[in-house]
Curated annotation (Swiss-Prot):
Keyword terms of this UniProt record: Ribonucleoprotein, Ribosomal protein
GO terms assigned for molecular function: structural constituent of ribosome
HAMAP family tied to this protein: Ribosomal_bL28 (MF_00373)
GO cellular component, one term: ribonucleoprotein complex
Organism: Amoebophilus asiaticus (strain 5a2)
NCBIfam families assigned: L28
One Pfam family of this chain: Ribosomal_L28
Protein name: Large ribosomal subunit protein bL28
BP-aspect Gene Ontology terms: translation
Name of the coding gene: rpmB
Family of this protein: Belongs to the bacterial ribosomal protein bL28 family.
Length: 83
């Protein structure tokens, strides 16, 4: 299972874990992804997406269809079937 946001394309980043003695070892920073069910009133259906928590807040503010259209314009998602 990939750790990628369906809307924004956020992925794990690579960085360093730094100890108290300033020793550095590689680690991964994972995005906070959640499986979330969204209701689409235009099609009277539900869709399940794996999205970051920041996207959940954006969807609550703008609406699911507006966020999907914006992501398609930006090119982060190619085609998402709603319904």
């Amino acid at each position: 299972m990939s750790k990628v946001c369906d809307i924004t394309g956020k992925r794990p980043r690579v960085g360093n874990k730094v100890s108290h003695a300033n020793n550095k070892t590689k680690r991964r920073f994972y995005p906070n992804l959640q499986f979330k069910k969204f209701y689409v009133p235009e099609t009277n259906s539900w869709i399940v997406l794996r999205v970051s928590t920041s996207v959940i807040r954006t969807i609550n503010k703008k609406g699911i269809l507006e966020v999907i259209k914006e992501a398609q314009r930006k090119g982060t998602i190619s085609q998402l079937i709603v319904g």
